[in-house]
């Protein structure tokens, strides 16, 4: 991807405002220095995993949780409707728009944003509890959330997962058979925007082989623990 294209894609950032000014930003965390200080003094690591939709990030996250007993997944709050099989408090904390807005006003999120037509946010309290128990917390979030958290906490490791190439990514999305043509085009546009922010991450890994990629990411986490402690 050329530098010119990256600049164009960066202008296509898909953050949208919540009632005029409620977008993902560091403001949600910086207003509560005590909460941020707890993060800075916590015993665990924050591991952030980001990638475009269709790159295999969710599958990698599930596999990491299976092979590493010290990892816990950060559970996001969302305004979207539950999908078949999803359980409250396990997959997501499901909120109405008004409930989500109230949590934002109370500075209850480490980060939050609108993605597609729904809001997603990371509750502070649950993450703080895990970190202070000495557990490492795995975040499955986008570049905006990664940027916000990295600015407001220490012991943060950010990993971006790339597809082998754009053509493979598009084919994976089509193979899902869950989106129409318009949705696929939107996902591809957002994917290229995501990829343009990969250079902001500590590590960039290409998922061209699942098992090999899993080993690479786990090795990064283990090395980060050794460095931190």
Curated annotation (Swiss-Prot):
Q: Which residues bind ATP?
A: 51-58
Pfam families xref list: Guanylate_kin
Record keyword Hydrolase present: no
Listed EC numbers:
2.7.4.8
Q: Where is the RPE1 insert domain?
A: 7-42
Give the Gene Ontology MF terms in alphabetical order: ATP binding; guanylate kinase activity
**Source species, domain of life:** Bacteria
- Annotated GO CC locations: cytosol
Enzyme type, top EC level = transferase
Give the subcellular location.
Answer: Cytoplasm
Q: Mainly localized where?
A: cytoplasm
* Annotated family: Belongs to the guanylate kinase family.
NCBIfam families per record:
guanyl_kin, RPE1
Q: List the protein's name.
A: Guanylate kinase
This protein's gene is called gmk
């Amino acid at each position: 991807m050329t530098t010119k294209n990256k600049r164009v894609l960066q202008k296509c950032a898909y953050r949208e405002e919540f009632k005029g000014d409620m977008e993902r930003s560091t403001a949600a965390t910086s207003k509560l220095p005590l909460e941020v200080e707890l993060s800075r003094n916590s015993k665990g690591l924050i591991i952030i995993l980001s990638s475009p939709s269709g790159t295999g990030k969710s599958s990698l996250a599930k596999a990491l949780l299976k092979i590493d007993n010290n990892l816990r997944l950060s559970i996001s709050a969302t305004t979207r409707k539950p999908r078949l099989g999803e359980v409250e408090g396990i997959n997501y904390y499901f909120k109405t728009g008004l409930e989500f807005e109230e949590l934002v006003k109370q500075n209850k999120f480490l980060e939050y944003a609108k993605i597609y037509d729904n809001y997603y946010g990371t509750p502070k309290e649950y993450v703080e509890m895990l970190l202070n128990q000495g557990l490492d917390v795995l975040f499955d979030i986008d570049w905006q959330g990664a940027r916000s958290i990295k600015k407001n906490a220490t012991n943060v490791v950010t990993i971006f997962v790339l597809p082998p190439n754009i053509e493979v990514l598009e084919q994976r999305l089509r193979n899902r058979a869950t989106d129409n043509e318009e949705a696929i085009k939107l996902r591809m546009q957002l994917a290229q925007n995501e990829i343009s922010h990969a250079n902001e991450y500590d590590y960039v890994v290409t998922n061209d082989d699942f098992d090999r990629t899993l080993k690479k990411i786990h090795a990064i986490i283990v090395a980060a623990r050794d460095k931190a402690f």
